[in-house]
From Swiss-Prot:
Alphabetically ordered keywords of this record: Hydrolase, Iron, Metal-binding, Protein biosynthesis
Entry's EC annotation: 3.5.1.88
Active site: E135
UniProt gene name: def
InterPro entries: Peptide_deformylase, Peptide_deformylase_sf
GO biological process: co-translational protein modification; translation
Protein name: Peptide deformylase
Residues engaged in binding Fe cation: C92, H134, H138
Reaction catalyzed: N-terminal N-formyl-L-methionyl-[peptide] + H2O = N-terminal L-methionyl-[peptide] + formate
CDD domains the UniProt entry points to: Pep_deformylase (cd00487)
């Protein structure tokens, strides 16, 4: 297993639209393992392949306190099951150190493949619903900062660009 490099906003590669995974093979399972290792080391609760510069429709997630509930979503799709949007404070490993409220549906239906390529479906609420929407956004080249005002987004971009200049 290996810890992968996480791309940071405003890296243009984060805007790449991920391609569906055709076959779930050992290479994909190795990527899944590396993504979990990377996410746990960061530390984070979710990671999309786009964030590690692999443009495939793959998300890993673990919302548990003790990191013992790993979830894999291959080619995930979701649909909102409620029209009401609620604010939820979001952060992102690709936008380190920044947290902002984003309005999202609080209940969604998710369809995806598991690490063995088997299809599954689940209804998610609360943090899981928010997290899957956030990670699916990554697969579509979108970041949580895109939901913010231009002023807030530009302020975050400038601060991160300054950090990148200072730390290489």
């Amino acid at each position: 297993m290996a810890i992968l490099t996480i791309l940071e906003f405003p890296d243009p590669r984060l805007r790449t639209i991920a391609k569906p995974i055709e076959t779930v093979d050992d290479g994909i399972r190795r990527l899944i393992d590396d993504m979990f290792e990377t996410m746990y080391a960061a530390p984070g609760i979710g990671l999309a392949a786009t964030q590690v510069n692999v443009h495939k429709r793959l998300v890993v997630m673990d919302l548990s306190e003790d990191k013992n509930e790993p979830r894999v979503f291959i080619n995930p799709e979701f649909e909102a099951l409620t029209e009401e949007l609620e604010p939820y404070q979001e952060g992102c490993l690709s936008v380190p150190g920044f947290y902002e409220n984003v309005d999202r549906p609080q209940k969604v239906r998710i369809r995806a493949l598991d690490r063995d390529g088997q299809p599954f479906e689940l209804v998610a609420e609360g943090l899981l619903a928010v997290c899957i929407q956030h990670e699916c956004d990554h697969l579509n080249g979108k970041l949580f900062v895109d939901y913010l005002s231009t002023l807030k987004r530009d302020r975050i971009r400038k601060k991160l660009e300054k950090q990148h200049r200072q730390h290489g």
